């Protein structure tokens, strides 16, 4: 039975969502109530000093059967980064609880003690079970039937240092890369130091999030950080911002795929009998949406989860193709362009923010590491690599195409060159593999809000997902301006997610433990984020309005 106990102990330190931890704690709370009152009281006393316990008491979160929304955040975001493919799963909750019921009372107490070591400070308080509930005596025969000592146990799905670097780089090197030359065209060459500055401060805010995670073992995700800092309201606000950011990324995927396909096939058009005509970008937007729709219906996203990790290779391939076209295929590099353009700087800042906004999954990467103490080094490597790649692509693209550079540099590359075709198809295929993974966290969070189990049937789920995907198509057709949408996302959402809220949460959770230098630096980043966000959002909305009226 020792192996069974170790398995349950491993499960405790593995990827558990908030509701799973509380259900596991509930399975052993009877024994705590009967024989471990002193230990439980001690845990409560130690709990009372943590930010999370204060948050619990302030918000009266005492019903473990109704934990705060979203419960599925960690699981769904792990799929997005490829850290925890859905095919690699642990024993279902019901099986774990049945197995726990077969243990002797002493073994249950041991499991509860180990659970309290890391989960005694969850975001949700644990209810005291009814005194009438008792643990039935153990039947040796049933114990033999339920024993899993002869079965191979899954290893804890923790990431090595190199895997964590790969996951972090995959999150950062995404849609922002393809529009970096356009961003430098808007701001001029002095935009490059600003890009470097953004890389430094966003890396620093990632380290601040790590310190928030270290403050209590119950904090495991970005919404958890928000709840620890500002209660349930903070959890809801941050969750909504993160899901809106993911939704906007799905819209950008459709725009990106349709723009590149229409560049390959510009003469495609369709006229409907009712007098409606569709041009090439509109046709390919609809077509690519139909192609990704079946992937959103899937329940098992294992293959897509593994393929999405190839996003790092795709980003490197795009940079190599761009350089090859300029150096080998005769386009050449020309040292021209403006030095600085203040009027367009807010748009550039928004795009830079869009390129560095990976903070939604940083807590997941930290929690999944075998050695979390090396997380700051992971961030430094990821941000350094992405910054170097961003600068290289921005310089190559701007010197190759000058003021004619478009919102996506793949649209400028001559289509008759083989590297150009490789780059364009890479820009088409990569979003196809990431679309379902990006929209799945939104789907899972919204499905949590469905009131009855009868409404959560497979057919209703497919209909719901189809409607959500269709809505991203409608938005993409309404605002088919890749760079402007990227600037809007970066100015409004990324400034909040990557700059403002990490600092605010850090100041709140570690209040009274920070030096004046740390407080001053956080205030500076907050002010910078607010000013940049307001200016960039206004500029992006103004451009969007002008484009819509043209």
UniProtKB/Swiss-Prot annotation:
InterPro entries attached to this UniProt entry: AA_transpt_TM
Biological process annotations from GO: amino acid transport
One Pfam family recorded for the sequence: Aa_trans
Biased composition (Basic and acidic residues): 1-16
Main location, first listed in the record: membrane
Disulfide bonds: none
Bilayer topology: Multi-pass membrane protein
Domain of life assignment: Eukaryota
Biased composition (Polar residues): 84-99
Keyword rRNA-binding: no
GO CC terms in record: organelle membrane
Subcellular location: Membrane
Disordered as annotated region, ranges: 1-99
Segments traversing the membrane: 164-184, 189-209, 236-256, 264-286, 308-328, 345-365, 375-395, 424-444, 459-479, 481-501, 521-541
Keywords: Amino-acid transport, Membrane, Transmembrane, Transmembrane helix, Transport
Keyword Cell wall biogenesis/degradation: no
Family label: Belongs to the amino acid/polyamine transporter 2 family. Amino acid/auxin permease (AAAP) (TC 2.A.18.5) subfamily.
Protein name: Amino acid transporter AVT1D
Organism: Arabidopsis thaliana (Mouse-ear cress)
